[in-house]
């Protein structure tokens, strides 16, 4: 049975991470949250008051405090910068609102893409982000691009934030998500777009379990054919 690589891309709050984690568990695959890597770089920038021209300082701290992932007792994924658990810190609104400019820095993308490709070499991995199918893993055996309305994505993020205890205004979230869509799809380096051979799936009004089933069936078919 061949171990394949699955790329799931899409805009903010399209369900990428939730779906990817479930499928990874079902298939016994490794899940790599690339968004958490860019959020970690953003956290470094904000914590130190760095700006675009300080990219080398961000890279230096990433080298000194490498990003790693560990499993919590409940099976959830923890994100570390060096020995610091930043799982909750990188999900705060200030990081969310600044991750677009940090992730658009060519030097940051080059370094993190290098790390992502190294992790994916052995296969049996599911990776989600915005440029996995186009840049990170252009030869992935299965590429999915998830979309959903801004209204629905704002509702999902609102619910997530409430559950995490993050103060959130729904209308502000809608505005922020629409603004991030524009930034992500218009940046010069690795803009958000579907790969030519990606399956585009609109998840508006679709349950998580239905999305998981759709993607997992596609994956299992490819695995069985390999």
From Swiss-Prot:
This is Cytidylate kinase. SUPFAM superfamilies: P-loop containing nucleoside triphosphate hydrolases (SSF52540). It is found in: Cytoplasm. The lineage of its organism: Bacteria, Bacillati, Bacillota, Bacilli, Lactobacillales. Pfam families: Cytidylate_kin (PF02224). Its EC number is 2.7.4.25. GO terms for molecular function: ATP binding; CMP kinase activity; dCMP kinase activity. The keyword Kinase applies. GO terms for cellular component: cytosol.
